[in-house]
Amino acid sequence: MIKQALISVSDKTGIVDFAKSLSDLGVKLLSTGGTAKLLADAGLPVTEVADYTGFPEMLDGRVKTLHPKVHGGILARRDLPEHMQALEQHGIPTIDLLVVNLYPFVATIAKDDCTLADAIENIDIGGPTMLRSAAKNHRDVTVVVDPADYAVVLDEMKANGNTVGHPTNFRLATKVFAHTAQYDGAITNYLTSLTDELKHASRSTYPATLNLAFDKVQDLRYGENPHQSAAFYRDLATPAGALANYRQLQGKELSYNNIADSDAAWECVKTFDAPACVIIKHANPCGVAVGNDSADAYAKAFQTDPTSAFGGIIAFNREVDEAAAQAVAKQFVEVLIAPSFSDAAKQVFAAKQNVRLLEIALGDGHNAFDLKRVGGGLLVQSLDSRNVQPSELRVVTKRQPTAKEMDDLLFAWRVAKYVKSNAIVFCGNGMTLGVGAGQMSRVDSARIASIKAQNAGLTLAGSAVASDAFFPFRDGLDVVVAAGATCVIQPGGSMRDDEVIAAADEHGIAMVLTGVRHFRH
């Protein structure tokens, strides 16, 4: 039975109401510092921990709760007579409920003007110590680290005579150990990323020890293949506009491949300012277009490769209205992603309950790093978020691209970044015309892109081509020109750049270099 609670929180969300409910149930309240003042100002009967222990706070508040009367009351096992006799001998009452959350270390180091001294002062000592003590003794002590659990604890107490059951106590304890592990991980990441202890850590510095923390969203039916198990985890600091913020409106449970492909589609479509549509198959764009609205963009994107679009993932950067919904509903679609769906669009898909509708608010946030597991290790790199501006482009051929060609080149370059290497993308008039992806040789990607356009009945005459990396030889360039391209955008940087540029001049086309490569594996 919960008779006494100790409350000490940095995040004071809902704490006054929670403490009042505890007091109404006859629970004695202990507290520290600012939390004690807040509760007292609210008219609640509360005892300061310093008065309770008979020992004042000291060292500018660094020592408040590190006292045997606190930790003895938390750690004593109620089922062991010798523990209870020790408490009685030393005049220590039990503490049955601990409500603690920690100094805001992560929020502190996120500030641009944070110094090492600021960070150090926001490393909580007493809080984690109490939390771990209570979580260790969860058979006898209820421990709450998350304000979202206040209601759960109160409901159980009211239903069971001020008692919280073991299943809930165990769940709350595991939550505590996860929280303190994440907290210590953040401290380790920060301190080991400092190049000089007198300076603030550079955000581009990789820590000597890397701790990662994610919360499980759900178990998945299976992994990339049916014989593989899988689960989906969400970053604790999910950036605005990230896929993990999705809200599923309808449809079957998401699979591993659904989530992976949806991320590829969403990241690509977010980069466009105009209404855009991206169709993804096996993590590669098979159709991308901008248009007057979502329906127009979809119609153009679908034209690129209707065969591959079957069973694909489709993303929009504008609301899906009735017209767009009716167009999409004619095809077999696995997942549809958009910032919003009109009521009329939802009605259209209500007749297709297997279609998964994901709603995600637009945002320009991105993961800070890309992670890739290798045998026994982890590759970590900054995100490829580089978007080349027109002013950075360098025309290296005798012929300058026209204004229309430049628009097509920039569109093609934006798409190529999201195509698996080696990537060749034909574009024109705000849409992809042919996509060659994932080939071991660039010339084969060029041939495949040309064949794709041919199969879709699309002309490549006057088209623009983007290559995610340089042309190592002129053969790839010869293929795209033979298909009808009149301008090319590529990074440059090959030992044979001069030969490739000479070939472009020989063909009378325009070539633009970005100086930026977009390998994607």
From Swiss-Prot:
Comment, domains: The IMP cyclohydrolase activity resides in the N-terminal region.
Name of the gene this protein is made from: purH
Pathway given in the UniProt record: Purine metabolism; IMP biosynthesis via de novo pathway; 5-formamido-1-(5-phospho-D-ribosyl)imidazole-4-carboxamide from 5-amino-1-(5-phospho-D-ribosyl)imidazole-4-carboxamide (10-formyl THF route): step 1/1; Purine metabolism; IMP biosynthesis via de novo pathway; IMP from 5-formamido-1-(5-phospho-D-ribosyl)imidazole-4-carboxamide: step 1/1
SUPFAM superfamilies in alphabetical order: Cytidine deaminase-like, Methylglyoxal synthase-like
GO molecular function, one term: IMP cyclohydrolase activity
Record carries keyword Phosphoprotein: no
EC number annotated for this UniProt entry: 2.1.2.3, 3.5.4.10
UniProt domain MGS-like: residue ranges: 1-145
PROSITE patterns reported for this sequence: MGS (PS51855)
Reaction it catalyzes: (6R)-10-formyltetrahydrofolate + 5-amino-1-(5-phospho-beta-D-ribosyl)imidazole-4-carboxamide = 5-formamido-1-(5-phospho-D-ribosyl)imidazole-4-carboxamide + (6S)-5,6,7,8-tetrahydrofolate; IMP + H2O = 5-formamido-1-(5-phospho-D-ribosyl)imidazole-4-carboxamide
Pfam families reported for this sequence: AICARFT_IMPCHas, MGS
GO terms (BP aspect): 'de novo' IMP biosynthetic process
SMART domains: AICARFT_IMPCHas, MGS
Record's GO cellular component terms: cytosol
Protein name: Bifunctional purine biosynthesis protein PurH
Family per similarity comment: Belongs to the PurH family.
Keywords for this protein: Hydrolase, Multifunctional enzyme, Purine biosynthesis, Transferase
Domain of life: Bacteria
Record-linked CDD domains: IMPCH
